[in-house]
């Protein structure tokens, strides 16, 4: 067996220098350290950067309470239901909710009346009123209308009773909320 080398002389079993292994570990450690440094830099830059907040105008809304009629407000079988502001950014003037921004509005009417009433919603001069209730004591109605600047929302109530002076409202409220802010708003 002259062609076979003895095991000690085999090149595959020769000890390798430790320099290559140490060099590989050093390169891996440097790459890992650079990755960690890059992550820390990113986190530090974004945690100390001032946040830019978008400034949207407040959403137009109002919650009003339906009021009890006084004797001077109740002279006919048809009258405007008095409103009192409880909360919100919109205003009540002469028992009407004043619309300052163009857009779609959600109008919600809730309450219980002591006698049967028909309620229509008026919102623009020259336009037909929107009928909400027809001869009922309980109101739980929601409607979405396109309203514009200078519109005034008010409720007209009609009773079959000889006198509306006995009419009372329990837990009555009208809520008006702008659904799509960003359109034209009065300054």
From Swiss-Prot:
Give the subcellular location.
Membrane
Q: Please give the positions of the paired cysteines in each disulfide bond.
A: 74-164, 101-185
Question: SUPFAM superfamilies recorded for this chain?
Answer: TNF-like
List membrane-spanning regions. Answer: 24-44
Q: How does it sit in the membrane?
A: Single-pass type II membrane protein
Q: Could you cite one Gene Ontology molecular function of this protein?
A: cytokine activity
The record's section on InterPro entries has: TNF_CS, TNF_dom, TNFSF4, Tumour_necrosis_fac-like_dom
An example GO biological process term is: immune response
THD domain location, by residue? 58-177
In this UniProt entry, which residues form the Extracellular topological domain(s)?
45-187
Membrane topology, Cytoplasmic segments: 1-23
SMART domains this protein is in?
TNF
Q: Which UniProt keywords apply?
A: Cytokine, Disulfide bond, Glycoprotein, Membrane, Signal-anchor, Transmembrane, Transmembrane helix
Quick one: a GO cellular component term?
membrane
**Record: glycosylation sites:** 94, 156
Main localization of the protein described in the UniProt heading: membrane
Family to which the UniProt record says this protein belongs: Belongs to the tumor necrosis factor family.
Assembly behavior: Homotrimer.
Q: Which PANTHER family does this one have?
A: OX40 LIGAND, TUMOR NECROSIS FACTOR LIGAND SUPERFAMILY MEMBER 4
- What does this chain do? Cytokine that binds to TNFRSF4. Co-stimulates T-cell proliferation and cytokine production.
Q: What is this protein called?
A: Tumor necrosis factor ligand superfamily member 4
**Organism the protein comes from:** Oryctolagus cuniculus
């Amino acid at each position: 067996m002259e062609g076979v080398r003895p095991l000690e002389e085999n090149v595959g079993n020769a000890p390798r220098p430790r320099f290559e292994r140490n060099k590989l570990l050093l390169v891996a450690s440097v790459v890992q350290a650079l990755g960690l440094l890059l992550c820390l830099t990113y986190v530090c830059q974004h945690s100390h950067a001032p946040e830019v907040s978008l400034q949207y105008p407040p959403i137009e809304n109002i919650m009003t309470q339906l009021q009890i009629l006084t004797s001077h407000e109740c002279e006919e079988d048809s009258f405007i239901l008095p409103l009192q502001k409880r909360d919100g950014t919109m205003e009540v003037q002469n028992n009407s909710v004043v619309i300052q921004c163009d857009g779609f509005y959600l109008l919600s009417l809730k309450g219980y009346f002591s006698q049967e009433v028909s309620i229509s919603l008026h919102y623009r001069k020259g336009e037909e009123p929107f009928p909400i209730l027809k001869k009922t004591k309980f109101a739980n109605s929601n409607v979405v209308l396109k309203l514009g600047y200078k519109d005034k929302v008010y409720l007209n109530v009609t009773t079959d009773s000889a006198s509306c002076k006995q009419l009372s409202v329990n837990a009555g409220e009208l809520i008006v909320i702008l659904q799509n802010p960003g359109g034209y708003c009065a300054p």
